[in-house]
Structures are given as structure tokens and as C-alpha cells.
Amino acid sequence: NGTEFERMGNASDLFAAFTYIVPGMPMIYTGQMSGNHHRLEFFEKDVIDRVENAPQKALYKGLNDLRAANRALWSNEKGAPMIRITADNDNVFACVRQKSCPKHGDNTVIAIMNMSAEPQTVTLDLTNLAGEYNCLCGKKMNVESTQTFELTPWKYIILTK
């Protein structure tokens, strides 16, 4: 029970992104895109505190746009299976989802997530995944066959092509 901020604190954005990366259908509950910090009454009419420029609005828009545009993240047989990437750090979750489509080309999503409240360093074996990617943050990133990432607490990197 409680809001996502009460339950997850600073990890709420990471776990929102996680639900978009793993197979299945991500759920957005009433008030999440507004950054609602108010517990809604159960089975009662309640008011949502809407924050116009809530950071969650941009977060969920970016995640929704990514999921719509990249076929690897689609649900069921239309999407791609999730494959864990071998990491040398148990606090970091890393995976790839790849989907080839003759009509729409190759779709690849790499996710690297620090699942802890401490800074983490991880080296990943990205053999066969090397190349230039778009980062969800809006920048381009070159991925090497073996690459080390420095991640602040609850930080995630989502790379696509």
C-alpha cells in the first residue's frame, strides 16, 4: 500500500522503466503520470493532485514512445524475448531484447539498471551488440564488445536501435 514514492522512494523511476523493459504490458495507475504523492481512497471518489510539469510526465511519455516505436518491446509473440546479459555485479540488472522484422528492420533494446541505493560499477560482455545506439536520455552512445558502466544509485540506461 501507499504511493509509489512511499513504497520505492528514489527507485520509483527505475522500476517504472523496468516494467517497460521486461516482457508483458506495463501498467500506469491513476495519478502516476502527474507525480501524484497523495494516497487515493479505495472505492471512493478522490481528487488527483495534478502537477503540470511533473518529471514523471516526461518519463512516462518517453517510455510510452519508446515502447510504441521499438518492436522488440511489444507484447506477446509480437515482441522479443528478454535475454539477461552476463554482469560482474549482482546489484546490476542488464538485458537485451532484439526483434528482426523484414518490413521494419532490426529493433534492439539494451537495459542496464543499478538495482541498489549505492553507486555501482559493472562490466558487461556485449559481444554481438557493439555499435551506435540511441540513449533514452536523448544522446548517442557507442557500445563496445566489452564495456564498463558507472551507475549512480537507482540509475538506469536504456539504449535502442
Say what each PLM segment does.
Residues 1-6:
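Active-site clefts of carbohydrate-active enzymes
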Residues 8-9, 13, 23-28, 32-161:
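Carbohydrate-interacting/catalytic domains
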Residues 16:
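Conserved glycine-rich, hydrophobic/aromatic-active-site segments
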